[in-house]
Structure formats: structure tokens, C-alpha cells
From Swiss-Prot:
Organism (species): Coccidioides immitis (strain RS) (Valley fever fungus)
Function comment: Component of the EKC/KEOPS complex that is required for the formation of a threonylcarbamoyl group on adenosine at position 37 (t(6)A37) in tRNAs that read codons beginning with adenine. The complex is probably involved in the transfer of the threonylcarbamoyl moiety of threonylcarbamoyl-AMP (TC-AMP) to the N6 group of A37. CGI121 acts as an allosteric effector that regulates the t(6)A activity of the complex. The EKC/KEOPS complex also promotes both telomere uncapping and telomere elongation. The complex is required for efficient recruitment of transcriptional coactivators.
Keyword Nucleus appears in the UniProt entry: yes
Protein name: EKC/KEOPS complex subunit CGI121
Description of how the protein assembles with itself and partners: Component of the EKC/KEOPS complex composed of at least BUD32, CGI121, GON7, KAE1 and PCC1; the whole complex dimerizes.
InterPro entries, per database record: CGI121/TPRKB, CGI121/TPRKB_sf
Cellular component GO terms, alphabetical: chromosome, telomeric region; cytosol; EKC/KEOPS complex; nucleus
Keywords, sorted A to Z: Activator, Chromosome, Nucleus, Telomere, Transcription, Transcription regulation, tRNA processing
A Pfam family recorded for this sequence: CGI-121
Localization, UniProt: Nucleus; Chromosome, Telomere
Amino acid sequence: MSLIETHHLSYLPESHPVHVALYRDLQNASFLREQLLAGNTEFEYAFIDASMIFSRNHIFAAIFRAVRDYINNRLKSKNVHSEIVFSLGGSNNIADAFRRFGISESTRDLLVVKVSTAPEITHESVSKHLEHNIKALPCPFTEESLASMTDRARLRKVYKFGSVGADTFKRLDEVEQGKNGSETTKEAARKHIDMLLMGAIAIRGAT
């Protein structure tokens, strides 16, 4: 069983819907990584370590950039799915992006993205393939699920937001621990972090 979501992103062609699924307690990370390294086209997905994803907006920003670059023949990596992982990196170092955001043998929570680049890639075909090949517990692709998986300390370190970002992460941690603030403070902090992450993705390669 998979709880796959299919989305048509604004400002992108209807012919390229995006399929997203989230899993917990992954048991076959090594197998999935081997398929990617072997170039097995049946496993052409963006396999992302969910501990490095802050929110739905975070991953959708990377997907949007990758699909847009795919449509405009501006890919810097092998295909649109590797480009999604690359886009998350916020820099022009492809190897670093895969090391930080891609699936590894130690990945336990997995976010899977598949872009329909051909008519035969459908919600049903992706769902069936994932159901047969992902050994993990499917879970809803929600903000709550992602928040329970995110390694905020590592995310802060990778994106290097400086004191402003560090203060916002600290404020969010304090609210969730019941030390300070309110639900409004929490939402404001999450929105600010989202903006920082989406900005990093949008300007990748500009400097």
C-alpha cells in the first residue's frame, strides 16, 4: 500500500504531474540506492532522505525548479529526478547535494518523487511500482509527518542561514517544547524558515 499524492503544480504544464509518497521505517535503503547507482531506469525517482525536508513547500520548491529546468533543457544533472535532489542543495555541487539529501544506506524515513515525463507514467503505475519495491510503512505526506522526521540541527548546518535562521529555528524549538510563544509564533517561525529554504533553492547557481 502507498499513500501517494499526485499534484499539478502551478505554472507548469498539465502534462507533467508530480507524484509524491512518504515512508517511515525504511528496510531496503541499500537495495534502492543500488538501483540508482546501477542506472536502473525502472527506479528513476528522486529518493530523498526525509530527515532533510522541512515542509511541503520546501520539497515543492525543489520540484518546481527541477521540472522547469527540465522543460527548458537546462538540467545540470542526469535527469529531472536527480535534478530535484540537486535543487535541494542550494549550491552547484551535485555530489554534496546527493550526499546530504539523497538516499543513503542509513536512511530510515524516505520521501519519493516521480515526475510524469511520459504518458505511461501515471498515479496508478507509480503507486503499483512503489508498493512492490519499497519496504517501509507508508504515511501521509503532511506537515505533521514531515515535522516528526526533520533533523533540524542538520538542516541548519547544511543551509548555513546564519544568526537570523538560527534564531528562527531556536524560536520554533522553544514553542514546540512549551517554553515560550504561541501557535501564532510557531506558524510565523515555520513560514520564515520556509521562505529561507525556498530562497536558497531559487537562487542556486546565481552566485
